[in-house]
């Protein structure tokens, strides 16, 4: 079985070892069945399971496989029953015990969630805590369904199952990803077991690009189906990262920068080119989760996405489709040879030449964003923000500015933040704090410059988009306000201020349906508080 890992989301790999799922040999009779499951051929796997149980009703391997099929179908309680029956016959099999544990833990989580549906997806989320996510999640997934279908020519016939874990323990239970995986490698989503899983953005300080992560996971689902689960990790990850924003952004012109070239990714690629130190496609196996640092993980995604950029520039949409189809019957090097007419080594060399020719430039102040699981303490976010400031002098001055602002002295706080910027001029945290206090003093125009600079360094900060929304709202630039506030929802959808502003904005631009949705969301957030 081949699998792949991704920044902000990981396709299942060797991480299941903690559950013992790979701890024993697979019964040869069901090896093909496992391959059917992991390539999403669920109906065929179900036929095999039914036939096997019918012929050998007291066969532990047959009952175990029947449990796996039910698990992949989302029938978790029935899966537990099948695993129990198998364990009653042979209780020593660690792999079987692992599957039973995973099924039981998943059932314990999912039974607390509400089911939501759209034409092509079934979503499970905690209604009380995460119910506001459902309409945004399903809208994103439906747009991804259409955009990726147009790009790659695949539309799943069955509804795709999606699960949003409400917190880190629940996410660990259903995905096997740990707290370390989230905070050290950015693993907040996973595609496995015939479904997509992410952790709620509410569970992380400052949120994350959760809707793009859903689209990213859906891409993995599509790639598995199109390649019969034979795509190598670099292709999996590269395609998922390259296409994950297609649901919200049109295909850029041929000579324009693709969306994967974020400030951090550009900087990492520039450094890799200068030092000739790449992660390399082979080192991405068996999973990016095993790379040592967040920077290595992010560089791996940047390399993989740029390889897809290279393929797309040279072979276009048809080339990507042919590559995936060819992988169903040939190895990766053979597929490269067939599609590109060159060896895999030549492909890698040409890709690096392509990168050199892009004229990438490092972005001063950019760095890999690290995720942090939120605690129950409000001050935790302030502590996390301060730790993001690398300069000790800037950190001290920022902390002093916070204390001064807490005493109601906005003008003095602004001066202190400006002093902090002298020591760390590209810090998004300080730039945002300065902009926020300027807005507080109704100096909206002055807030634009620090916010633009913050966005240039870090385009994934919800705070920057919220403050820009306030600036545009005050100036009655409602279309611009709409754009940045909707961007904030895509990162941290739990800020009531965003929806207060959006109610005004949607009303002003004449969008009654969105106005109603924003009002409902605002009411739910304020009532919950």
Describe each PLM feature range.
Residues 25-27, 60-61, 94, 394, ...:
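Helix-start (N-cap) detector for alpha-helical repeat units in TPR-like alpha-solenoids
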Residues 38-39, 72, 106, 406, ...:
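Register position in tetratricopeptide repeats
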Residues 43, 72, 77, 251-297, ...:
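Amphipathic alpha-helical substructures
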Residues 55, 89, 423, 457, ...:
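Structural marker of alpha-solenoid helical repeat scaffolds
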Residues 110-236, 243-253, 263, 270, ...:
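Juxtacatalytic substrate-recognition/specificity segment
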């Amino acid at each position: 079985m081949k699998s792949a890992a991704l920044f902000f989301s990981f396709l299942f790999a060797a991480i299941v070892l903690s559950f013992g799922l790979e701890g024993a040999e697979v019964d040869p009779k069901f090896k093909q069945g496992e391959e059917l499951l992991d390539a999403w051929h669920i109906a065929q796997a179900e036929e095999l399971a039914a036939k096997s149980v019918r012929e050998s009703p007291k066969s532990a391997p047959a009952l175990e496989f029947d449990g796996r099929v039910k698990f992949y179908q989302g029938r978790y309680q029935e899966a537990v029953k099948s695993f129990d029956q198998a364990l009653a016959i042979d209780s020593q099999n660690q792999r079987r015990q692992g599957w039973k544990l995973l099924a039981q833990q998943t059932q314990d989580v999912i039974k607390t969630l509400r089911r939501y549906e759209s034409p092509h997806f079934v979503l499970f989320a905690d209604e009380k805590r995460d119910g506001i996510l459902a309409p945004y999640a399903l809208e994103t997934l439906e747009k991804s369904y259409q955009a990726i279908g147009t790009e790659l020519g695949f539309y799943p016939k069955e509804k795709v199952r999606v699960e949003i874990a409400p917190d880190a323990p629940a996410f660990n239970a259903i995905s096997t990803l740990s707290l370390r995986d989230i905070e050290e490698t950015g693993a907040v989503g996973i595609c496995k077991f015939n479904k997509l899983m992410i952790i709620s953005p509410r569970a992380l300080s400052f949120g994350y690009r959760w809707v793009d992560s859903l689209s990213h996971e859906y891409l993995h689902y599509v790639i598995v189906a199109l390649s019969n689960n034979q795509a190598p990790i670099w292709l999996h990850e590269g395609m998922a990262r390259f296409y994950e924003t297609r649901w919200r952004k049109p295909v850029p012109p041929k000579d324009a920068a693709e969306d994967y070239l974020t400030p951090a990714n550009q900087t990492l690629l520039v450094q890799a080119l200068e030092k000739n130190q790449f992660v390399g496609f082979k080192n991405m196996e068996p999973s990016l989760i095993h790379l040592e640092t967040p920077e290595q993980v992010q560089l791996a995604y940047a390399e993989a996405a740029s390889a897809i950029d290279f393929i797309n520039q040279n072979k276009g949409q048809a080339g990507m489709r042919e590559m995936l189809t060819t992988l169903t019957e040939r190895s990766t090097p053979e597929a490269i040879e067939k599609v590109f007419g060159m060896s895999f080594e030549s492909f890698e060399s040409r890709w690096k030449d392509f990168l050199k020719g892009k004229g990438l430039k490092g972005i001063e102040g950019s760095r890999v964003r690290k995720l942090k699981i939120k605690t129950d303490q409000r001050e935790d976010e302030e502590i996390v923000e301060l730790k993001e400031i690398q300069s000790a002098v800037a950190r001290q001055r920022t902390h002093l500015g916070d204390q001064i602002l807490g005493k109601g002295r906005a003008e003095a706080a602004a001066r202190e933040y400006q002093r902090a910027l002298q020591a760390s001029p590209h810090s998004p945290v300080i730039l945002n704090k300065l902009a926020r206090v300027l807005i507080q003093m109704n100096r909206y125009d002055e807030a634009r410059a620090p916010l633009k600079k913050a966005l240039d360094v870090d385009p994934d900060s919800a705070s920057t988009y919220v403050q820009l929304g306030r600036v545009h709202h005050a100036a009655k630039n409602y279309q611009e306000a709409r754009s940045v506030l909707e961007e904030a929802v895509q990162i941290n959808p739990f800020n009531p201020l965003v929806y207060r502003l959006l109610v005004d904005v949607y009303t002003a631009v004449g969008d009654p349906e969105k106005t109603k949705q924003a009002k409902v969301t605002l009411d739910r957030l304020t009532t919950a508080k």
